[in-house]
Protein backbone atom coordinates (compact mmCIF):
# COMPACT_ATOMS: atom_id res chain seq x y z
CA UNK A 1 0.00 0.00 0.00
CA UNK A 2 1.44 3.32 -1.05
CA UNK A 3 1.05 6.28 1.30
CA UNK A 4 0.26 9.50 -0.51
CA UNK A 5 0.25 12.70 1.55
CA UNK A 6 -1.47 15.76 0.21
CA UNK A 7 -1.16 19.25 1.60
CA UNK A 8 -4.72 18.94 2.90
CA UNK A 9 -4.09 15.68 4.78
CA UNK A 10 -0.86 17.06 6.21
CA UNK A 11 -2.65 20.23 7.36
CA UNK A 12 -5.44 18.16 8.94
CA UNK A 13 -2.96 15.93 10.75
CA UNK A 14 -1.07 18.96 12.07
CA UNK A 15 -4.32 20.57 13.23
CA UNK A 16 -5.37 17.39 15.00
CA UNK A 17 -2.08 17.28 16.87
CA UNK A 18 -2.39 20.91 17.92
CA UNK A 19 -5.95 20.42 19.13
CA UNK A 20 -5.19 17.21 21.02
CA UNK A 21 -5.57 17.43 24.80
CA UNK A 22 -2.40 18.74 26.33
CA UNK A 23 -0.89 19.95 23.08
CA UNK A 24 1.39 22.90 23.63
CA UNK A 25 1.06 22.71 27.40
CA UNK A 26 3.89 22.26 29.82
CA UNK A 27 4.19 18.94 31.56
CA UNK A 28 3.19 18.40 35.18
CA UNK A 29 5.77 16.19 36.79
CA UNK A 30 5.91 14.34 40.10
CA UNK A 31 9.51 14.63 41.23
CA UNK A 32 11.52 12.02 43.09
CA UNK A 33 10.90 14.06 46.25
CA UNK A 34 7.14 13.54 45.88
CA UNK A 35 6.45 17.17 44.92
CA UNK A 36 4.55 18.20 41.81
CA UNK A 37 6.47 20.62 39.58
CA UNK A 38 6.19 22.21 36.16
CA UNK A 39 8.86 21.72 33.54
CA UNK A 40 9.07 25.53 33.20
CA UNK A 41 9.89 26.17 36.86
CA UNK A 42 13.30 27.77 37.39
CA UNK A 43 16.19 25.34 37.61
CA UNK A 44 17.70 27.11 40.58
CA UNK A 45 20.95 26.94 42.51
CA UNK A 46 18.73 28.22 45.35
CA UNK A 47 20.34 31.64 45.60
CA UNK A 48 17.25 33.81 45.69
CA UNK A 49 19.07 37.07 44.90
CA UNK A 50 20.48 35.53 41.72
CA UNK A 51 17.10 34.07 40.78
CA UNK A 52 15.37 37.41 41.38
CA UNK A 53 17.99 39.26 39.27
CA UNK A 54 17.59 36.72 36.45
CA UNK A 55 13.81 37.15 36.53
CA UNK A 56 14.12 40.93 36.32
CA UNK A 57 16.66 40.66 33.48
CA UNK A 58 14.12 38.49 31.62
CA UNK A 59 11.38 41.08 32.27
CA UNK A 60 9.47 38.75 34.56
CA UNK A 61 8.09 38.85 38.07
CA UNK A 62 9.54 36.56 40.73
CA UNK A 63 7.67 34.12 42.94
CA UNK A 64 8.42 31.33 45.36
CA UNK A 65 5.96 28.45 45.26
CA UNK A 66 5.87 26.41 48.46
CA UNK A 67 4.48 22.90 48.61
CA UNK A 68 4.83 19.65 50.52
CA UNK A 69 4.64 15.96 49.77
CA UNK A 70 1.10 14.58 49.85
CA UNK A 71 -0.58 18.00 49.67
CA UNK A 72 -3.95 17.57 47.90
CA UNK A 73 -4.20 21.27 46.98
CA UNK A 74 -0.68 21.17 45.53
CA UNK A 75 -1.72 18.27 43.33
CA UNK A 76 -4.84 20.20 42.29
CA UNK A 77 -2.71 23.28 41.51
CA UNK A 78 -0.62 21.28 39.08
CA UNK A 79 -3.23 18.92 37.61
CA UNK A 80 -6.14 21.38 37.28
CA UNK A 81 -4.95 25.00 37.49
CA UNK A 82 -1.73 24.62 35.52
CA UNK A 83 -3.53 22.23 33.15
CA UNK A 84 -5.59 25.27 32.12
CA UNK A 85 -3.62 26.74 29.20
CA UNK A 86 -4.74 30.31 29.98
CA UNK A 87 -3.44 30.13 33.56
CA UNK A 88 -0.34 28.11 32.76
CA UNK A 89 0.79 30.31 29.87
CA UNK A 90 0.19 33.55 31.78
CA UNK A 91 2.17 32.43 34.81
CA UNK A 92 4.93 30.86 32.69
CA UNK A 93 5.25 33.91 30.43
CA UNK A 94 5.18 36.56 33.18
CA UNK A 95 6.88 34.95 36.19
CA UNK A 96 9.99 33.06 37.16
CA UNK A 97 8.87 30.56 39.78
CA UNK A 98 11.24 28.83 42.18
CA UNK A 99 9.70 25.79 43.84
CA UNK A 100 10.50 25.05 47.49
CA UNK A 101 9.45 22.36 49.98
CA UNK A 102 8.01 23.69 53.25
CA UNK A 103 9.74 20.78 55.05
CA UNK A 104 12.76 20.58 52.73
CA UNK A 105 16.38 20.32 53.75
CA UNK A 106 18.04 21.85 50.67
CA UNK A 107 20.16 24.88 51.49
CA UNK A 108 18.71 28.17 50.22
CA UNK A 109 20.57 31.48 50.21
CA UNK A 110 18.01 34.14 51.03
CA UNK A 111 17.87 37.74 49.88
CA UNK A 112 19.89 38.83 52.91
CA UNK A 113 22.67 36.35 51.91
CA UNK A 114 22.11 33.99 54.85
CA UNK A 115 21.97 30.29 53.99
CA UNK A 116 19.36 28.11 55.67
CA UNK A 117 17.24 25.05 54.92
CA UNK A 118 13.99 25.35 53.00
CA UNK A 119 12.17 24.46 56.23
CA UNK A 120 13.94 27.25 58.14
CA UNK A 121 13.22 29.74 55.34
CA UNK A 122 9.55 28.73 55.37
CA UNK A 123 9.57 29.40 59.12
CA UNK A 124 11.25 32.78 58.65
CA UNK A 125 8.55 33.77 56.15
CA UNK A 126 5.77 32.22 58.29
CA UNK A 127 4.66 29.96 55.43
CA UNK A 128 2.29 27.49 57.04
CA UNK A 129 -0.07 26.36 54.27
CA UNK A 130 0.58 24.80 50.90
CA UNK A 131 0.50 25.67 48.17
CA UNK A 132 1.65 29.20 48.90
CA UNK A 133 2.97 31.69 46.36
CA UNK A 134 5.14 34.53 47.64
CA UNK A 135 5.70 37.38 45.20
CA UNK A 136 8.76 39.62 45.49
CA UNK A 137 9.59 43.07 44.19
CA UNK A 138 11.83 46.06 44.89
CA UNK A 139 11.03 48.67 47.54
CA UNK A 140 13.53 51.17 48.83
CA UNK A 141 16.37 49.41 47.03
CA UNK A 142 15.61 46.08 48.74
CA UNK A 143 13.90 42.90 47.60
CA UNK A 144 10.76 42.42 49.68
CA UNK A 145 7.63 40.30 49.62
CA UNK A 146 4.93 42.35 47.89
CA UNK A 147 2.05 39.86 47.85
CA UNK A 148 1.17 36.38 49.03
CA UNK A 149 -1.30 33.77 47.87
CA UNK A 150 -1.78 31.07 50.52
CA UNK A 151 -3.81 28.10 49.30
CA UNK A 152 -5.92 28.13 46.16
CA UNK A 153 -8.46 30.72 45.12
CA UNK A 154 -11.01 29.87 42.42
CA UNK A 155 -9.31 29.87 39.01
CA UNK A 156 -10.39 33.40 37.93
CA UNK A 157 -9.14 34.95 41.19
CA UNK A 158 -6.00 32.81 41.13
CA UNK A 159 -5.08 34.16 37.70
CA UNK A 160 -6.10 37.67 38.78
CA UNK A 161 -3.56 37.54 41.63
CA UNK A 162 -0.75 37.00 39.13
CA UNK A 163 -2.08 39.86 36.97
CA UNK A 164 -2.33 42.08 40.06
CA UNK A 165 1.30 41.45 40.93
CA UNK A 166 2.50 41.73 37.32
CA UNK A 167 0.77 45.11 37.04
CA UNK A 168 2.46 46.34 40.24
CA UNK A 169 -0.99 47.17 41.63
CA UNK A 170 0.12 46.12 45.14
CA UNK A 171 1.82 49.51 45.48
CA UNK A 172 -1.47 51.39 45.26
CA UNK A 173 -4.27 49.13 46.40
CA UNK A 174 -5.15 45.84 48.05
CA UNK A 175 -6.01 42.79 45.99
CA UNK A 176 -9.74 42.76 46.79
CA UNK A 177 -10.16 46.46 45.90
CA UNK A 178 -8.16 45.92 42.70
CA UNK A 179 -10.36 42.93 41.79
CA UNK A 180 -13.51 44.99 42.35
CA UNK A 181 -12.13 47.78 40.15
CA UNK A 182 -11.36 45.24 37.39
CA UNK A 183 -14.96 44.03 37.43
CA UNK A 184 -16.46 47.53 37.40
CA UNK A 185 -17.98 48.63 34.05
What are the roles of these predicted feature ranges?
Residues 88-116:
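Thiol-based oxidoreductase modules, predominantly thioredoxin-like and allied folds used
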Residues 129, 137-170:
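Non-catalytic, surface beta->alpha helical segment in thiol-disulfide oxidoreductase systems
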Amino acid sequence: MELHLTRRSLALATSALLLAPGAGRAATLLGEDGLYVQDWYVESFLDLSEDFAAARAAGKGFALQWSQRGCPLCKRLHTEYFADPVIESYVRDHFSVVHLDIFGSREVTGFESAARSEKALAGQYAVRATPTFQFFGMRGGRVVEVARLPGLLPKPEFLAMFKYVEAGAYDGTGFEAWMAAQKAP
